[in-house]
Structure formats: C-alpha cells, structure tokens
From Swiss-Prot:
GO cellular component term of the entry, any: small ribosomal subunit
GO BP: any one term: translation
Keywords of this entry: Ribonucleoprotein, Ribosomal protein, RNA-binding, rRNA-binding
NCBIfam families referenced in this protein's UniProt entry, alphabetically: S20
Keyword RNA-binding in annotation: yes
PANTHER family from the UniProt entry: 30S RIBOSOMAL PROTEIN S20 (PTHR33398), SMALL RIBOSOMAL SUBUNIT PROTEIN BS20C (PTHR33398:SF1)
Any one GO molecular function term: small ribosomal subunit rRNA binding
Function text: Binds directly to 16S ribosomal RNA.
Similarity field: Belongs to the bacterial ribosomal protein bS20 family.
Record has Ribonucleoprotein as a keyword: yes
Pfam family, one: Ribosomal_S20p
Gene that encodes the chain: rpsT
Protein name: Small ribosomal subunit protein bS20
C-alpha cells in the first residue's frame, strides 16, 4: 500500500486509466469480431449487401483502432498489426485467389 499522498493519487489515476483502456480495447475487439463475422457471412453467401457490410465493419474497426493508438491505449505497431490482420482477412474474402 502506498504511504504518501502522491503515490496514493497515482494508484487512483492508474486505476481510472486502466478502466478507460479496458473499455477502448473491448469495443475495438468487438468491432474486429464483427468484421471477421461479416467476412465469414460474405464468403458463405456473396452479394452486394454482404460486401457493403464487410466494408463498413472494416471502416468502423479501423477507426476505433486508430483512435486507440491516438489516445495511447495501443502501441502504434500493435495497432498496425491489428489493421493488417483485418485487411488481410477482408482481402482474402473480397479478392479470392484466381
């Protein structure tokens, strides 16, 4: 347990930041899962509506990842890695190997 006032305050601040970061990461993961699910749905039944769903979910996930990096929740390399995973999955579905 902290002994002085500044250490106690730092503990409070760290807990507040941890909770804020947790919500950011949770919503980011949710949007990524939605994008992967949209990719699966498109590969099962291709169509214009499913393709639009894939693209909008990818845009939303990219936006959330960029904001998480900007705020400092994620390291920029981690954010780039997540975006790379998403775009690879989307590319695999939308542009099948010919």
């Amino acid at each position: 347990m902290a002994n002085n006032k500044s250490a106690k305050k730092r503990i409070e601040i760290a807990e507040r930041n941890r909770l804020r970061n947790r919500t950011y990461k949770s919503s980011m993961r949710t949007l990524m899962k939605r994008c992967f699910a949209a990719c699966d749905a498109y590969s099962a039944t291709p169509g214009d509506e499913a393709k639009a769903s894939v693209q909008t979910s990818m845009r939303a996930a990219f936006s959330k990842i960029d904001k998480a990096v900007k705020v400092g929740v994620l390291h920029r390399n981690n954010g780039a890695n997540q975006k790379s995973r998403l775009s690879a999955a989307v590319r695999k579905v939308l542009e099948p190997a010919s």
